[in-house]
């Protein structure tokens, strides 16, 4: 979430990649640049920090400078696949790993989709079409990032895709949920993975801006918090390359105290 989130990733991810021997790092990047969209330079910063692939959400297309990269099959960044078909960019792409290719898909929930920067289709119907056209090899790992508001919707798509994909990782709340699990069909699932950025804030925004809005309805501008404690949230998923099913899942949460 904003500059604070980028700096947390830059500070922690390089050592985590080594410590955990990670094959693939996927980041939800729609709030990277000032909390809305992602610029080319910030995309490059995340890549330099160790992020292999970036998924999207309702602000993915806010900055036009990233559109060309999203439309390039060789650039590891996507927008939600259930944007209407004529929308710029791609909603799923493959990326190579030491254990073979991984298909990464980004989806937007129907509730948050009402406020998206572009119109959206039904995510369940779209994922059906994608899997039918792309998953001829059932051993290919498939990771789905689901950007949605309602926990009920996130539960539904997780269980709908159980056994069809390797992982369904929810986000959008900026707050991690304590429900990381491997579903009966072998699909890793979490309702919300959380965010990287300010901890002492309202989802990354300064309390001084948010409290007056809730207290007496004053209209205030969202300013991102850059001071205080920071947080790093992620989900570690181990996938069996022979079956493309999840065999281990673990939440990662680190709190960074402000430097004195």
Where are these regions (language model features)?
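Acidic, metal/ion-coordinating pockets
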Residues: 1-260
